[in-house]
Amino acid sequence: MFLTACGFSPVYNENNTTKLIQQISIQEPSTQEEFIFYSHLVDRFGSMGDKYVLNYAISTSTEDSALDFDGTVHRIEISGSVSFSLKDKENGINLLSDKEEMYLSYSNAGSTAAVLNAERTTNKQLVVLLADKVADRVSIAIVEKDL
């Protein structure tokens, strides 16, 4: 309650989050990573909005991150980044353009099936976390700019 008195209002209050539902048209996915990203954003914002357009480009890479002296790899790091832009659908004005990055890692120990499962799970978690970061940034931008 004291935040309202000073002019601040929570980003995640009911009015701000419901304002975004069905207002953002999200770029259609073309890869498995993009589908996971897209699905997560649709869960947050709905789909087929008519006010804003959200475009994105996802990239991931893997790197050995824990090696012992004989060169055995014990952990694999997956780095991911997403460049995104939010535009006004009516006039094409760019409202937000930025990049989010993060990384996760998984153990390379165990059976082939276990390692492949760890890789898939970690990759999915990374893309979901990137989608959360983008959704938060978009929500904050819309509230800050009072759109």
Regions found by a protein language model. Give the residues of each.
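Short amphipathic
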Residues: 23-29, 98-102
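C-terminal motif of bacterial Sec signal peptides marking the signal peptidase cleavage site
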Residues: 2-5
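Bacterial signal peptide processing site
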Residues: 7-10
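Post-signal-peptide N-terminal segment of Sec-exported extracytoplasmic proteins
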Residues: 27-59
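Surface-exposed short loop/turn segments
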Residues: 49-99, 103-121, 128, 132
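Acidic/histidine-rich, surface-exposed loop or edge segments in extracytoplasmic proteins
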Residues: 18-27, 111-114
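Sec-exported extracytoplasmic/periplasmic mature domains
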Residues: 42, 46, 131, 135-139, ...
